[in-house]
């Protein structure tokens, strides 16, 4: 996990001129701690870079650094829109942001709230829908976990329910 975090944040930090990833974007944000995060040398490929306008739009709307969205996209799918994770899990993930079936209800509600139309799981393959939803999830995780970027990345990777169970069992560290 430490390698994943380092790779994801390396792409963010190497492409970003910001000193704090969400400074001012999240209510009561007190700054960003990078303690314990190793910076790697991951690069974004051309497929991920082709979605950068979407990352900027969604990032602006939800207070998430577009470079963080790009880094997560790179890690999750390498920008391959038809990417499908079939690892034997009953909850496969699809699209450039690897949105899982478990998020079906919240994805549909997000679509209805933002566009007036309930989105289906098939809509995960539409980057214009998947990227804003991912930005929304990230912004909500940053609020929920008090701007703890490690927990936000873990929440995106494992799912909020799994992370909350781990925290309940092992503590908040």
PLM segments and residue spans:
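Cleavable N-terminal signal peptides
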Residues: 8-10, 20-22
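Positively charged n-region of N-terminal signal peptides that target proteins for export
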Residues: 1-4
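Catalytic glycan-binding domains that act on GlcNAc-containing polysaccharides
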Residues: 24-173
